[in-house]
A protein has these predicted regions:
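Short, solvent-exposed loop/turn segments at secondary-structure junctions
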Residues: 40-44, 106, 130, 181-183, ...
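Glycine-centered flexible beta-alpha turn that most often forms the glycine-rich phosphate-binding loop
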Residues: 212
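N-terminal "arm"/small-domain region of PLP-dependent enzymes with the aminotransferase-like
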Residues: 2-72
């Protein structure tokens, strides 16, 4: 049986999906005659290979009974505790029961879309934003509304104007997705003043903030910015090991209130039962 975009067997929400341009460029990057600038692929020689070797050895010898077995949907408790310690370093106090491990932050984006978005719901993003986040959300057929940014991050005056326009319509605003540190692709960092105002607006207009923070630890000058999550527990925070350890170890995490996380966990059960316990043990070590 031949399947194409006209097939009546394909779900409507999938029929109009398009591949991310970034992933298409990754596919071309395997050619030996190509020097790829398409994605944030680190130089392998700079990765902590010796530390990874030791961690893999520990996983396969000392903890093989755990590392080679199924795990819990929310992720290994010890790994979550280790990541909670990392979060504490940036000013976010979170408990293991408020964290769920994912297959990279990309799976986290998809889980959030499946958990929260109905067709026609509104998602606010920085314009432009991370293309593959849009790919994750678009599977659930929301309306994506972009808000411009400048050198200080998303323009709060323009955001407030957009919120007022949305309030006059009949569509539901569900969430705002932001990369406040070294925004992708803009590279800008949201100021502390604008972060405070964003949180105020989220309460006034009752929408969720999704804080995607893969780059926050890559700051080499100046002090670290206080995460939105540290200022408001309602914020859903996404982290990843990809940019600070190795992208081949597919470990990301969601920090959210426990009742919200319980809903996301139900969705993850249907997606993959559990993440890679082996990767979790390696990261923990």
């Amino acid at each position: 049986m031949k399947f194409d975009q006209t097939s009546d067997k394909i779900a409507d929400r999938v029929r109009n999906l398009r591949s991310s341009a970034v992933r298409d460029l990754f596919a071309a990057a395997v050619r030996p005659d190509i020097i790829s600038l398409s994605g944030g692929m680190p130089d392998v020689s700079l990765l902590p290979q010796r530390a990874i070797q030791k961690a893999v050895h520990a996983a396969i010898t000392d903890e093989r009974a755990v590392a080679l077995q199924y795990g819990s949907t929310n992720g290994r408790l010890e790994t979550r505790q280790a990541l909670c310690d990392i979060m504490r370093d940036i000013g976010v106090r979170v408990k293991p029961e408020e964290m769920l491990l994912t297959s990279g932050a990309q799976q986290a984006l998809n889980l959030l879309g499946e958990t929260f978005l109905d067709k026609g719901d509104i998602v606010l993003v920085e314009g432009p934003t991370y293309l593959t986040a849009l790919s994750a959300f678009n599977a659930y057929e929301p309306e994506i509304h972009s808000v411009p940014f400048d050198d200080e991050g998303m323009r709060m005056d323009l955001l407030e104007e957009e919120l007022k326009r949305i309030g006059k319509g009949n569509k539901r605003l569900k969430m705002l997705y932001t990369i406040p540190n070294f925004q992708n692709p803009g590279g800008v960092t949201m100021t502390g003043e604008r972060r405070k105002r964003l949180i105020e607006l989220s309460h006034e207009y009752d929408f969720m903030i999704i804080e995607d923070d893969p780059y926050g630890r890559l700051r080499y000058e100046g002090g670290h910015m206080v995460p939105l999550k540290a200022q408001d527990d309602r914020v859903i925070y996404l982290g990843t090991i990809s940019k600070i350890f190795a992208p081949g170890l597919r470990i990301g995490w969601i920090c959210a209130p426990a009742d919200v996380l319980a809903r996301i966990s139900l969705v993850k059960q249907g997606a993959d039962l559990c993440g890679s316990t082996f990767d979790q043990v390696v990261v923990e070590h």
